[in-house]
């Protein structure tokens, strides 16, 4: 409250009311003086000297707020001081009001909370406080957090006695500038050698940008575009390892430290400090602090104290007991009865014994190893034989022709006796363990559905899968992929009305529910095995082209392509685009087979721009485009029958073959396919091979003819050699 306003109020009661109103708003109560106790002399307005603000400034000091009793008695103290303090005040040194210091509490700025320093841990290194102040004030990182990882046992990979600091940068540029400035400050001030992982130096950034531009030019010349989810320039995360600083090492008792020490070498004195600098998005994405906190909690539960050495216990032998010569017959029989029975978990169980052979009982070797339960052991042996015979049955079924294999599978799910294969299969199934029997039954149903057996339905397969997971049986990744292939199995029928060119929605729903259940059981579904299967399932299974819905019935099949509605075609494209975004965001590694499947889908849908983009991404992924890729490419264009596309592909891809690392040269198989494309693009190639044709096509045509003739000559020589060897007399 302004002093001018207080001095302007001449009445003592008015001043008290004004002061009481402001003080009551701050939560402090003042007891007003009794009216009857005020004498006429005291009721007279006091002399307004310069000491008036000095007496009343105590009401707004920190003491009045901290102790309400002092503020409550302020009026009585002032009234008592008025009687005898005037001579004393005159004797004191006069201090004008404009020279007196005021205690003002400044309101905290909202951004102040982001710049608060974290509390120091126990026994911190001397440099830690200065380090935190520099990170917060000079380079401007927000939301600082400090984790004390010195108690971790075993220590983390960054090193023992670790203290980790987290900070948020305001942008990627601020992140790089802050890390560079921080490292330079550590080098110049403390002569440290920090290691900043993820920081690009000024010259290194220029080099990377120059290389990226050069790579983009090379890719553009190859007929593709540069598309990479991560260019390696902006990561949003820089880890600065300050190094080992003096002090801050937690002390441990000598005896306990020697007992728990394993290894060799000297213990390094000091504390390692690591500063994690991240942008706000990257910090929320990886949530590194939560991971380290979980590690600390687990470490505190696992190691409440230093471990104490324990005496070595004898090994526990499952299924057999080993006794020494000092064990009596009664004790021996008791030990046998108390031995746990054999568990049929279908794994090979081993045990070792540390007792010496000379201490064994020499009176008889029959008591050295005694089976605990003969019935369980016999059942386990039968189960093992069943496990060996079931794969042989599936191997026999896979070697049959599709029609004969369908006959061996009988009438359907309920048929168990119509064929010898089913009889033997279910006999072996009854001998094996429940979890293996359930998995083998699922395998049989998948095989039947993939063979397009009409008696086995996908709904029954999914129901059997639900029973398998409800029983809490193991769900290996190979079994999930096998069931997924069966649910996504589909054969297009262009002659039906309307044409069946895509997987039905009900089958797709079952497949998605399968993937969801597998993810809940811990299977990694962000993998090429799952994503590419779904990508192919939502796509068309034959060559199509889009027309308007009104022209769908009148549109004809052109160029081996079937007309489809443009609305459905765009819906398929949207789903494919979302799946492609997931693949790029999750950085899913694709292989040769996956890229060939994607190329075929884009070719079937007539999306040539996406086709050549995917062709260029193969080289960017580090996959060699060898003979298999070019066989697929030229075969695809030969099947399409489009002479314009074939001509463009020949002119662009034949030089590309010779620029591959290693180059792809013509052999008889590849030359045959390229010859078909040349004959399609240039029908009169034989007559006009020397006239008005590009030199590249003429040269390629001669190479193909030469490769095919050489192959025929080699085959003729082999037949002659075989004929001569067949006529030679046997030794």
UniProtKB/Swiss-Prot annotation:
Q: What's this chain's function?
A: Probable mitochondrial mRNA stabilization factor.
The organelle targeting sequence, given as a residue range: 1-29
Spell out the protein name for this chain: ATPase synthesis protein 25, mitochondrial
- Is this entry keyworded Lipoprotein? no
The UniProt regions of compositional bias labelled Polar residues, in chain numbering, are: 76-90
According to Swiss-Prot or TrEMBL, what is its membrane topology? Peripheral membrane protein
Where found, per UniProt? Mitochondrion inner membrane
The segment annotated Disordered runs over: 68-93
Q: Chief location of this protein?
A: mitochondrion
Give the organism the record lists. Answer: Paracoccidioides brasiliensis (strain Pb18)
Lineage, highest ranks first: Eukaryota, Fungi, Dikarya, Ascomycota, Pezizomycotina
Listed GO biological process terms:
mitochondrial gene expression; mRNA stabilization
Assigned GO CC terms: mitochondrial inner membrane
Similarity section: Belongs to the ATP25 family.
Has the keyword Transit peptide been applied to this entry?
yes
């Amino acid at each position: 409250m302004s002093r001018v306003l207080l001095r302007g109020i001449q009445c003592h009661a008015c001043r008290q009311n004004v002061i009481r109103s402001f003080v009551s708003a701050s939560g402090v109560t003042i007891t007003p003086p009794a009216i009857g106790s005020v004498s006429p002399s005291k009721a007279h307005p006091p002399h307004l000297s310069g000491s008036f603000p000095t007496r009343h400034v105590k009401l707004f000091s920190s003491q009045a707020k901290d102790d309400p009793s002092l503020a409550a008695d302020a009026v009585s103290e002032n009234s008592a001081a008025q009687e005898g303090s005037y001579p004393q005040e005159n004797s004191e040194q006069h201090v004008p009001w404009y020279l007196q210091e005021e205690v003002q509490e400044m309101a905290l700025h909202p951004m102040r909370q982001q710049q608060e320093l974290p509390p120091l841990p126990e026994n911190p290194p001397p440099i830690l406080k200065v380090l935190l102040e520099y990170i917060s004030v000079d380079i401007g990182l927000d939301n600082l957090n400090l984790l004390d990882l010195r108690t971790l046992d075993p220590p983390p990979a960054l090193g023992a006695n670790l203290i980790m600091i987290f900070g948020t940068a305001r942008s990627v540029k601020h992140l790089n500038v802050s890390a560079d400035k921080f490292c330079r400050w550590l080098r110049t001030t403390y002569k440290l050698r920090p290691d900043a992982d993820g920081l690009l130096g000024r010259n290194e950034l220029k080099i990377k940008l120059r290389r990226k531009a050069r790579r983009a030019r090379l890719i553009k010349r190859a007929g593709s575009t540069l598309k990479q989810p991560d260019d390696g320039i902006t990561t949003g995360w820089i880890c600065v390892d300050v190094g080992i600083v003096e002090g801050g090492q937690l002390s441990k008792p000598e005896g306990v430290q020697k007992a728990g020490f394993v290894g060799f070498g000297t213990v390094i004195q000091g504390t390692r400090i690591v500063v994690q600098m991240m942008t706000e998005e990257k910090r929320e994405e990886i949530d590194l602090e939560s991971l380290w906190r979980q590690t600390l909690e687990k470490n505190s539960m696992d190691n409440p104290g230093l471990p104490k050495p324990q005496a070595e216990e004898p090994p526990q032998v499952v299924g057999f007991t080993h006794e020494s010569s000092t064990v009596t017959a009664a004790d021996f029989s008791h030990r046998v009865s108390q031995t746990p029975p054999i568990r049929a978990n279908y794994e090979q169980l081993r045990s070792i014994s540390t007792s010496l052979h000379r201490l064994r009982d020499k009176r008889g070797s029959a008591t050295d190893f005694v089976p605990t339960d003969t019935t369980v052991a016999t059942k386990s042996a039968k189960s093992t034989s069943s496990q060996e015979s079931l794969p042989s049955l599936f191997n026999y079924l896979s070697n049959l022709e599709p029609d004969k294999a369908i006959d061996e599978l009988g009438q359907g799910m309920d048929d168990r006796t119509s064929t010898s294969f089913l009889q033997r299969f279910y006999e072996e199934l009854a001998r094996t363990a429940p979890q293996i029997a359930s998995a083998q039954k699922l395998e049989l149903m998948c095989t039947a559905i993939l063979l397009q057996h009409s008696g086995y339905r996908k709904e029954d397969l999914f129901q059997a899968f639900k029973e398998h997971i409800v029983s809490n049986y193991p769900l290996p990744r190979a079994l999930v992929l096998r069931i997924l292939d069966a649910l996504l199995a589909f054969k297009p029928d262009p002659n039906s009305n309307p044409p069946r060119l895509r997987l039905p929605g009900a089958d797709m729903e079952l497949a998605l529910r399968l993937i969801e259940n597998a993810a809940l059981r811990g299977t990694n579904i962000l993998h090429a095995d799952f994503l590419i299967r779904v990508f192919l399932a939502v796509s068309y299974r034959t060559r199509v082209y889009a027309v308007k819905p009104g022209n769908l019935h009148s549109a004809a099949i052109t160029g081996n392509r079937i007309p489809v509605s443009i609305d459905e075609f765009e819906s398929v494209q949207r789903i494919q685009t979302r799946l492609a975004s997931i693949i790029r965001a999750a950085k899913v590694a694709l292989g040769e087979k996956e890229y060939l499947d994607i190329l075929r889908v884009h070719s079937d849908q007539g999306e040539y721009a996406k086709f050549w983009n995917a062709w260029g991404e193969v080289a960017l992924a580090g996959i060699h485009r060898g003979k298999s890729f070019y066989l697929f490419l030229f075969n695809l264009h030969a099947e399409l029958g489009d002479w314009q596309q074939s001509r463009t592909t020949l002119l662009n891809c034949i030089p590309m073959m010779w620029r591959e690392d290693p180059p792809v040269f013509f052999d008889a198989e590849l030359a045959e396919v390229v010859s078909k494309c040349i004959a399609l693009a240039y029908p009169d190639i034989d007559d006009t091979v020397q006239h008005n044709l590009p030199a590249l096509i003429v040269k390629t045509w001669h190479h193909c003819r030469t490769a095919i003739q050489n192959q025929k000559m080699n085959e003729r020589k082999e037949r002659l050699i075989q004929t001569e060897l067949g006529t030679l007399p046997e030794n």
